[in-house]
Amino acid sequence: MSVLIAIDQGTTSTRTVAFDKDLNVICSEQKEYPLIYPKDGWVEIQPKELMNSVYTTLDPVINSCSDVCAIGITNQRETTLVWDADSGKPIYNAIVWQDRRTAKQCMQLKQDGNE
């Protein structure tokens, strides 16, 4: 039986779901992770938490299936995470889409007609 796997990394958790050819759920796993608020208006997630949540949810789903034909990945809006190309390590925490640290700059761009 062909199986489609979806990995949905949301704002506070990762969910991995396996579907059969008729889109019936075969298996589903979810792992939450904490948001970090280092300063007022800042919202971050530790990169290791994000990666661990993928492994934690994907492993049992894949192990319960055979004949995986595709894996789709969704993520949380404009959350940004930068990795060092040489070391493979994250440069900083993921900056979550809710983060407001650049609100003033964005407002200025909008006022200048750069929307």
Named regions from a protein language model:
Residues 1-92, 104:
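N-terminal glycine/serine-rich phosphate-binding loop of ATP-dependent small-molecule kinases
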Residues 98-115:
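Glycine-rich phosphate-binding loop plus the immediately following alpha-helix
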